[in-house]
């Protein structure tokens, strides 16, 4: 399906503030849907969703650069979107992308109609340790990527494995992987956003190996009136592992 995506919606490069950013855009007929992958992923990470929704929505999936902090990343993304004529949009983020989506809403709530937070967090501290931070700071980008790809190579053969080997192993630069993983370790809790919780969808998986039960409960408590969907056996990548269930839940919420 990645080859189908690349043929139908090839990556384009947008320059903002002197930084070149890869995006996948569909220019569909409906409202813009901004999609933000996690720390390990590219603008093509949501290939199944982009192919499913690309005609009905103007999907803009962004391989965002790592910034000084999440606030600066979000400001850059808002400037990027404005530069391509997008001022109002729905946003879907997964993992660190979900964290970043909340910063976008915090900085510019009037820009966002609905927000989908998949396998995400608002408080990163449970995922942070001094050891992880020091290891990343003391490792070269190349070493970090080698370690990530090595773990993928040892995983069970599946669509997830083959897709991530392509997206991360061949598509994501060592610097991007290290910078985003560092961003997770340096992140701070998202300030309280002024946004209707009826316009928020939380997606979690009961077997997510990266977002532990306490982090899942924390984001639910943070947005107690948000809509909430559990995808069973979706792992950390339900949009690949359980695409039908994921697409149905998100599509219903966003009225696609």
Regions of interest found by a model, annotated:
Residues 234-247:
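Catalytic histidine-centered segment of alpha/beta-hydrolase-like enzymes
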Residues 45-51, 58-92, 248:
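Active-site loop/oxyanion-hole signature of alpha/beta-hydrolase fold enzymes
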Residues 207-211:
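Acidic catalytic loop of the alpha/beta-hydrolase fold
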Residues 12-67:
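Conserved HGGG/HGGXW glycine-rich cap/lid loop of the alpha/beta-hydrolase fold
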